[in-house]
Amino acid sequence: MPTINQLVKVNRKAKTWKTKAPALNRGINTLIKKVTKIASPQKRGVCTRVATMTPKKPNSALRKYARVRLTNGMEVNAYIPGEGHNLQEHSVVLIRGGRVKDLPGVRYHVIRGTLDTQGVAKRSQGRSLYGVKRPKVKK
């Protein structure tokens, strides 16, 4: 605990805050080729690589991810949620923030059911996160 004199000499410093999804906080003005600080909730990008990765201990699986070049010029790794996907190289995807705890370096998620990404087939519960329309009711 500092004394009053110590606080008079040196003020308390506010903690510096660092964003968890830096690629979403950077835009680019293509007319003047300048980086802007306009943040966005999602970004569009093109897949440069679609592959699998093994998670950290103690988990074991083959998690699907895509390397995505965004419209602001950055290249990031994005997790592909759900069972099965149709993504290939050059697929156009929409990404959102949100890390995958057991995959190092993966801080974004691909949004299913938009652009070139199809929704998860035969999904009936928790559909909105996986881009699935409401199934038709049989009479």
UniProtKB/Swiss-Prot annotation:
CDD domains: Ribosomal_S12. One of its GO terms (biological process) is translation. Pfam families: Ribosom_S12_S23. Keywords: Ribonucleoprotein, Ribosomal protein, RNA-binding, rRNA-binding, tRNA-binding. PROSITE patterns: RIBOSOMAL_S12 (PS00055). The keyword tRNA-binding applies. GO terms for cellular component: small ribosomal subunit. Gene3D superfamilies: Nucleic acid-binding proteins (2.40.50.140). GO terms for molecular function: rRNA binding; structural constituent of ribosome; tRNA binding. HAMAP family: Ribosomal_uS12_B (MF_00403_B). With S4 and S5 plays an important role in translational accuracy. Interacts with and stabilizes bases of the 16S rRNA that are involved in tRNA selection in the A site and with the mRNA backbone. Located at the interface of the 30S and 50S subunits, it traverses the body of the 30S subunit contacting proteins on the other side and probably holding the rRNA structure together. The combined cluster of proteins S8, S12 and S17 appears to hold together the shoulder and platform of the 30S subunit. NCBIfam families: rpsL_bact. Belongs to the universal ribosomal protein uS12 family. Part of the 30S ribosomal subunit. Contacts proteins S8 and S17. May interact with IF1 in the 30S initiation complex. This is Small ribosomal subunit protein uS12. It comes from Mycoplasma mycoides subsp. mycoides SC (strain CCUG 32753 / NCTC 10114 / PG1).
